[in-house]
Amino acid sequence: MSTVYGKIERNKRTYQVYTPVEYGGRITMEAYKQEFIDFMVESDVLKFGDFTLKSGRKSPFFMNAGAYVTGSQLKKLGEYYAKAIHETYGDDFDVLFGPAYKGIPLGVVTAIAYSELYGKEVRYCSDRKEEKDHGADKGSFLGSKLKDGDRVIMIEDVTTSGKSMEETVPKVKGAADVTIVGLMVSLNRMEVGKGGEKCALDEVKDLYGFETAAIVTMEDVVECLYNKECDGKVVIDDELKAAIDAYYEKYGAK
């Protein structure tokens, strides 16, 4: 069982604070991941209820990264991405690539945070939905140009089908002789992708041959928020937990 060791107040919301859950003496979730889950909830990015996804699936939860709108939220978001990238991929990369449109601010704020946290200057790059045919920055990309030998990390908010990678990877590979080191998303929904068995991140890994990772998974979210109070209300109660379990019984990756 997790142990409550206090309460914190953020943005006028009071949260119970838990120590990481331990199994066999092993801490299963890093502190920054627990903080990131709280951050998604308090930013109204991660919501629970009844939602219809683009895929047509009925889901008891929904993530909207477009709800990060303030300077302080974007600063924190960049820091969480930077920490996860540093922990997962280390420093051996040159460019953060965020596919348009939501990936554009992700690449910018993460590049800033990486410089501040780890003292390494990395460039950011994004693609354009429509090629610009005039001016000094004309072309298919925003930010830094991709160069031969660049090692690139892709950044997205969430990957549910891998469709964005189908469009983005050929663009990046076609721009220069680069190596795509990996992909980092904020949340792995852990549900089956187009193939019907593996999750979308695993499908991307198998298809393109680079690593994929997420700051947190839905398993982390449930572990952190189940029976946890926010403003006197449990975030994931028994009823919602049952709905999430039923959703993954139907759509969960094998």
Where are the predicted features?
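PRPP-associated nucleotide enzymes
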Residues: 3-155, 160-254
